[in-house]
Amino acid sequence: MQDSLTLKPVDYIQGKINIPGSKSISNRVLLLSALSNGKTILKNLLYSDDIKYMLKALLKLGIFYKLDKKKSKCTIYGISDAFSVKNKIKLFLGNAGTAMRPLLAILSLKKNKIILTGEKRMKERPIHHLVDSLRQGGANITYKNKKKFPPLYIKGGFKGGKIFIDGSISSQFLSSLLMAAPLAELDTEIIVKNQLVSKPYINLTINLMEKFGISVSILNDYKHFYIKGNQKYISPKKYYIESDLSSATYFLAAAAIKGGSIQINGIQKKSIQGDINFIKILKQMGVSIQWKKNSVICKKNKLLGITVDCNHIPDAAMTIAILGVFSKKKVYIKNIYNWRVKETDRIYAMSTELKKIGARVITGKDYIKVYPVKNFIHAKINTYNDHRIAMCFSLISLSGTSVTLLNPKCVNKTFPSFFKNFYSICHYSNINKNI
């Protein structure tokens, strides 16, 4: 894919879409399958950069797996234990938080000599909250360069026990502890300090652990968790990965802005993904939503402004911010501090790039206000190597003005076929389709 991509103005949106498997589920079940007994067949696997980093890491850790030709089915052979590697190895994990954080916790269980590292941005994403919690349970982890950030040197030693963790930065820290705890020598009691962000992702983790034979006790409204130690993960033999609801938000938003209608297949109303709440927010904004058994249909209606707390759906919240420039009144998204520690500082990035296309934007430490735009300006959008920035700003081509995305290939992190899918629902008048 070229270094920049100009999307021409779209006349209207219409079509049906099949969304690849969830990134959050894919990397979790790959890891849980590797830790389980025997063979697990995973269907509808997402095959993107973040997943490739996890697969390469598992291979280096001694796990054998097979992908089918479409790379959407993975047969993985587990070892029924935590990983223990005799030689000193280095695992490069790109900017994949869903690989870095859980692998750090799991690799802390056994005697190891493993370095975890990644891209420049990964080395800027704080991880000390998880490191501190693992150290409370006996883990021997040191920072290779800058304190509080990767790369990390792991020697093992985590035994469980009473652990405190800050829940206000990233739910992945707590998810990582939860996944490691059943394999620890001792029972683990986790006490969450401060407000827990992205709670649906914790529910997702616990749901998947249950599918692999482990139960987690949730006490005191997600402030306290209890997991028995010295357990084994048990393979479900087969597991079908839900389509990624975070990825679906861009197509739902496209219909809300410029429909026509969109039907997204492979999504159920009772999804285990927290971003199902994005669809509820669309309804609150006046968008027409119709559910079928295994799909959802979104049709354009009015698009109202909204004030919404997006603490639990930080990724989908970015799409809501884009809807703000198309809505009748402002969109106010609050309680999103963790945008600042994602693939980039997303509050800064969204504000900066939205202003380029003519939007009025007000931001604070943990909020963003986006006002409707009357006259859109063609702009070159810096994507900050952030897949969600690129996918969000693709929607600006629905404004009647073209938009140019720099480094569009960053979508490969989670959705390599995004532009192919996007073009498939775009209909143009008197211009050629984008190539």
From Swiss-Prot:
The keyword Cytoplasm is assigned to this record: yes
Location(s), subcellular: Cytoplasm
Pfam families documented for this protein: EPSP_synthase
Keywords: Amino-acid biosynthesis, Aromatic amino acid biosynthesis, Cytoplasm, Transferase
Binding site for 3-phosphoshikimate: K23, S24, R28, S170, S171, Q172, S198, D315, N338, K342
Domain of life: Bacteria
GO biological process terms, semicolon-separated: amino acid biosynthetic process; aromatic amino acid family biosynthetic process; chorismate biosynthetic process
Active-site residues (renumbered): D315 (proton acceptor)
InterPro entries: Enolpyruvate_Tfrase_dom, Enolpyruvate_Tfrase_sf, EPSP_synthase, EPSP_synthase_CS, RNA3'P_cycl/enolpyr_Trfase_a/b
Pathway as given in its UniProt record: Metabolic intermediate biosynthesis; chorismate biosynthesis; chorismate from D-erythrose 4-phosphate and phosphoenolpyruvate: step 6/7
Protein's UniProt keywords contain Cytoplasm: yes
GO CC, alphabetical: cytoplasm
Binding-site residues for phosphoenolpyruvate, renumbered to this chain: K23, G97, R125, Q172, R346, R388, K413
Function: Catalyzes the transfer of the enolpyruvyl moiety of phosphoenolpyruvate (PEP) to the 5-hydroxyl of shikimate-3-phosphate (S3P) to produce enolpyruvyl shikimate-3-phosphate and inorganic phosphate.
Protein family: Belongs to the EPSP synthase family.
The protein's name in its UniProt record: 3-phosphoshikimate 1-carboxyvinyltransferase
Protein source organism: Buchnera aphidicola subsp. Cinara cedri (strain Cc)
